[in-house]
């Protein structure tokens, strides 16, 4: 899917019309303007791209530390450095939006956070700070990579992973048990770039170690936004979905994923049985719009045969 420059225009528009946060402290450095502190209590924070005509390139140490109000932060597009413990114990921070001139996060920047979403606008090549973000977060994360005109956007899922210390009494040792496939996905980077081929090759770990819902979401994301997706891996994702269409129906209803439902319609992947399952899930959840869509697809793809009578 080609992405035009409107995405960057839209990002900048969000930083206009009095949406830019003014409750900041800053100072001028040799590397550009540094935001040293955000002292507001808004849940949605948009940081300025420029201060006094100079680009904001640094977010200082502890800039958002212990802020329990902030839930979403739009970072300066020219940002190149994030200091140590910048978001320390921002327990309610769920989403970051940033450009890719930032290649690393300072030590402990996300300690005590529970990030769920990250959007990165790829302005210069494919390198970004994504690796340092997902390595610091053990929770499941949804990632959106927006490319400039002519590129492909990606919508990715990084599953959860965690370690558990289990006592081996006979051997008198503690063994480390790993849970979830997320650890494998967090190793799919080379020189700060995501290796899509390696990412796709980890899918069997998701199938074996994570929930069916997680595997469905990951596979559908890769099919809908196929950045650097090989034919072999495309086929693998599609075959998985075809074998788990009831779970697909349940997930699309739960997420109200209309575009995902339509995508599977265009690919002729829905079966009559899975459409009926989707209708049942939608009816149970009182999601009338989704129910109507499933009914229309079934009517279109599996029309009832008219009965004929012979005299």
Question: What does each model-identified segment do?
Answer:
Residues 257-265, 287-296:
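Ankyrin repeat structural motif
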Residues 251-257, 281-287:
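Ankyrin repeat A-helix N-terminal signature
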Residues 219-237, 259-264:
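Repeat-mediated protein-protein interaction surfaces in helical alpha-solenoids
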């Amino acid at each position: 899917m080609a992405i035009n420059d409107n995405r960057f225009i839209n990002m900048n528009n969000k930083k206009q019309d009095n949406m830019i946060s003014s409750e900041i402290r800053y100072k001028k450095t040799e590397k550009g303007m540094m935001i040293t502190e955000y002292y507001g209590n808004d849940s949605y924070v948009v940081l300025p791209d420029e201060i006094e005509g100079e680009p904001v390139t640094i977010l200082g140490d502890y800039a958002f530390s212990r802020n329990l109000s902030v839930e979403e932060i739009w970072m300066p597009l020219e940002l190149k450095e994030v200091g140590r413990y910048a978001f320390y114990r921002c327990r309610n921070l769920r989403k970051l939006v940033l450009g890719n001139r930032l290649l690393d996060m300072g030590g402990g920047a996300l300690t005590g956070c529970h990030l769920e979403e990250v959007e990165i606008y790829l302005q210069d090549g494919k390198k970004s700070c994504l690796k340092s973000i997902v390595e610091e977060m053990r929770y499941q994360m949804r990632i959106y990579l927006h490319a400039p005109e002519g590129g492909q956007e990606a919508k990715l899922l990084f599953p959860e992973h965690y370690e558990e210390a289990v006592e081996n009494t006979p051997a008198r040792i503690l063994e480390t048990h790993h849970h979830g496939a997320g650890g494998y996905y967090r190793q799919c980077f080379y020189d700060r770039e995501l290796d899509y081929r390696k990412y796709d090759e980890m899918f069997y770990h998701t199938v074996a170690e994570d929930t069916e819902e997680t595997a469905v979401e990951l596979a559908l994301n890769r099919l809908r936004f196929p950045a650097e997706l090989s034919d072999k891996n495309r086929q693998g994702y599609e075959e998985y979905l075809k074998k788990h269409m009831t779970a697909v129906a349940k997930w699309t209803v739960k997420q109200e994923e209309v575009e995902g439902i339509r995508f599977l319609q265009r690919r002729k992947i829905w079966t009559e049985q899975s459409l009926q399952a989707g209708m049942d899930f939608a009816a149970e959840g009182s999601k009338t719009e989704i129910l109507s869509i499933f009914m229309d697809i079934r009517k279109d793809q599996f029309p009832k045969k008219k009965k004929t009578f012979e005299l």
